[in-house]
């Protein structure tokens, strides 16, 4: 069974690099306070690492 990660956006995407905005979109995050559940895969962990300064992981 694959474990799920709860990801919450805690900072705005306004003024961020296009690469960061695309990564937020890839995770399915749209606005501050938005929380999504994603599978704990290497690709998702890489996206989280790139955006660690604007996400909260539970």
UniProtKB/Swiss-Prot annotation:
Keywords per UniProt: Ribonucleoprotein, Ribosomal protein
Gene3D superfamilies reported in the protein's UniProt record: Ribosomal protein L30, ferredoxin-like fold domain
GO biological process: translation
Single GO MF annotation: structural constituent of ribosome
One of the Pfam families matching this protein, by short name: Ribosomal_L30
GO cellular component terms listed in the entry, alphabetical order: cytosolic large ribosomal subunit
Lineage: superkingdom: Bacteria
InterPro entries per record: Ribo_uL30_ferredoxin-like_sf, Ribosomal_uL30_bac-type, Ribosomal_uL30_ferredoxin-like
Family per record: Belongs to the universal ribosomal protein uL30 family.
Description of how the protein assembles with itself and partners: Part of the 50S ribosomal subunit.
Protein name as it appears in the record: Large ribosomal subunit protein uL30
Native organism: Buchnera aphidicola subsp. Baizongia pistaciae (strain Bp)
Gene encoding the protein: rpmD
